[in-house]
From Swiss-Prot:
InterPro entries according to UniProt: CB (IPR044068), DNA_brk_join_enz (IPR011010), Integrase-like_cat_sf (IPR013762), Integrase_catalytic (IPR002104), Integrase_recombinase_N (IPR010998), Tyrosine_recombinase_XerCD (IPR050090)
GO MF terms held by the record: DNA binding; site-specific recombinase activity
Protein name per Swiss-Prot or TrEMBL: Putative integrase/recombinase HI_1414
Active site positions, chain numbering: 174, 199, 256, 259, 281, 291
UniProt-listed PANTHER family: INTEGRASE_RECOMBINASE HI_1414-RELATED, PHAGE INTEGRASE-RELATED
SUPFAM superfamilies: DNA breaking-rejoining enzymes
Residue ranges of every copy of the Tyr recombinase domain listed in the record: 131-304
GO annotation terms (biological process): chromosome segregation; DNA recombination; establishment of integrated proviral latency; symbiont entry into host cell; viral genome integration into host DNA
Source organism of the structure: Haemophilus influenzae (strain ATCC 51907 / DSM 11121 / KW20 / Rd)
Start and end residues of each Core-binding (CB) domain: 30-109
Organism lineage: Bacteria, Pseudomonadati, Pseudomonadota, Gammaproteobacteria, Pasteurellales
Coiled coil: none
Signal peptide, first to last residue: none
Gene3D superfamilies with a match to the protein in the record: 1.10.150.130, Intergrase catalytic core
Record keywords: DNA integration, DNA recombination, DNA-binding, Viral genome integration, Virus entry into host cell
């Protein structure tokens, strides 16, 4: 009898909460997971980072917190998720994921009327980790190229991945932009590559070194100029790069390290403003602190 009374009291409290939410024009009994799915269908496709956000949110949907009603998700729930997530990934990854989760609650509050207050209020973001400073040495590059078949052919994914690595070190282009580079956006006469839409939301033109041009000319001969220059999807490039670096015993490398290497090399040839134009950085401090990684021994030689 006592248990029945407790159940009735709990049910009554839930019903009161529903009535209260409805009186405020909010929608009770909506699962957090359903709101996330609506966001995936309506908001995520409008973003340039659609693919990455889709993967992030589908992973998040496997977490028990998404089984709660969105109106019941608390700040403590989010803080517990942060602590749990930090056990398996770096703080930068958690900060990115929190940005998306925070926007879901913002849309749920301001546009869809699911909640009257966001549980993200007062949430402390994990501290930013130190910027990565790893560069790609000639030894690293040679070790990967040596096992890639690049010297003999460009008809395999391994060989074209090696070509992309070499091209990245020459141009400072990101992996995604290399994979999407089309022949129509390459000007061999002016030695430039036009990138119509970049990470910062603008287009830019990248100058091409003689080595970069040589890579493209070889691709044109061996692969043809009917499709994209490197004829490789981003997902395939990523998977193949992981295999190659493991075989070459260079698992500590990230493809993005080639961008830092390229910009450090280019900094010896052009001024910082030109370097920012090449890289697409609007904030010079980010360029200097994150991507420019000079060898101080080389700098010392320049001082003599």
């Amino acid at each position: 009898m006592h248990r029945l009374r407790q159940c009735n009291m709990k049910w009554g409290a839930e019903e009161e909460k529903k009535i209260e939410l409805q009186a405020q024009g909010l929608q009770p009994d909506t699962l957090f997971s359903d709101v996330i799915k609506r966001y995936l269908n309506k908001i995520t496709p409008t973003k340039r980072g659609e693919k990455h956000e889709f993967n992030r949110l589908n992973r998040f949907l496997r977490h028990p917190v998404t089984d709660k009603y969105i109106s019941d998700v608390s700040r403590r729930d989010i803080e517990d998720w942060i602590a749990e997530r930090l056990e398996s990934v770096k703080s930068e990854s958690v900060r990115r994921e929190l940005s998306t989760i925070g926007h879901i609650f913002k849309i749920a509050l301001e546009r869809w009327g699911y909640i009257q207050k966001s549980p993200m209020v007062g949430i402390q973001l994990p501290e930013k980790g130190k910027p990565r400073t790893q560069r790609v040495t000639e030894e690293n590059i040679n070790a990967i190229v040596a096992i890639s078949e690049y010297v003999d052919t460009l008809k395999t994914a391994k060989a074209r991945t090696a070509a992309a690595i070499l091209f990245a070190v020459e141009t400072a282009m990101r992996a995604g932009k290399i994979c999407s580079l089309s022949w129509g956006n390459v000007n061999f006469e002016k030695r430039t590559a036009f990138l119509p839409m970049t990470k910062n939301g603008t287009s830019r033109t990248v100058p091409l070194t003689k080595n970069a041009i040589a890579i493209l000319e070889r691709l044109k001969v061996e692969i043809g100029d009917a499709g994209l220059c490197f004829d490789i999807k981003s997902s395939v490039l990523d998977a193949t790069f992981r295999k190659l670096k493991k075989l070459a015993e260079r698992e500590y490398l990230h493809f993005h390290d080639t961008r830092r290497e390229a910009l450090t090399r280019l900094s010896k040839k052009v001024d910082v403003m030109t370097l920012a134009k090449i890289s697409g950085h609007k904030d010079i401090s980010i360029l200097q602190n994150v991507y420019y990684a000079p060898d101080m021994a080389e700098v010392a030689e320049l001082l003599d």
